[in-house]
Amino acid sequence: MNAQPLVLHHYTSGTGLLGIFDSDSVWASLIHSQNDTKEFEHAIDEARTYLSTLRAADADAAHMAINLALSTSLDRIARLNIYVACFSAIEDSLSQWRGYCPPGFGYSLGLFGEELERVAGPQGFRLVKCIYDHAEQRPIIEQWAEYALQELRKTLPAGADPVQHVNDKCPLFFPGFAAFAPTMKDQAFRDECEWRLVGIVPSNDPRVRLRAGKSMLVPYVPIDLGLATNQSLVWNIRIGPTPNMELASNAATHFFRRARVRNGIGLSTIPYRDW
């Protein structure tokens, strides 16, 4: 895993911040509900493009059939129940205030990355850094595709149907794809400098719940933080642009009763007004 920044920031509304402290958790939402409409599909599209390039250069009928079947099987990967909780390496970001917080009612919660990784790991979540550069994404995708093809060709029994062989064996390669695909985002989002907690959670897992989204119900999984006993997790609370900075700051001190906030409360310095 890449060395994470000392502190990662979760941008949310005042209601969301209350929810974090009241439930002692952050919520990881189903990846397909994120504001990037191409979430997860981006890596699938890139993999299919590369597989198509390899297929065009291969005259072996069995190899071509395996390649095409693997490309088709990516639809099954897209249906995996992958959940993500999002953070930014930037503490006071205009794009984050505008994108993830309601007008005049935004907060960011600063959490120590190493400690966040420690508490989330036993719950099935990894802390990963998002990749926006296509030049960095491509080798990862190509390595996965080449390895999968090599293994599928090597294990194809004599006289066996290549398509059925791929259908039987391709789930072995899904975890590898699911490990990197949630980190790959369109470069239009690079200013977010995003890190994520990522986990695969079956649909029948009792932790799965529903919350109200802007236009639909969104499945989510709470990731327990242990704020009352963990003295090393919370770094700060920052209040976003609001017409009542002093009142908002005074009210936020009540969170000190719930958890140790090591660097106290900060105020956004961005001269932005959205009320």
Spell out what each predicted region is.
Residues 1-275:
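Partner-binding and oligomerization surfaces adjacent to conserved cores of proteins
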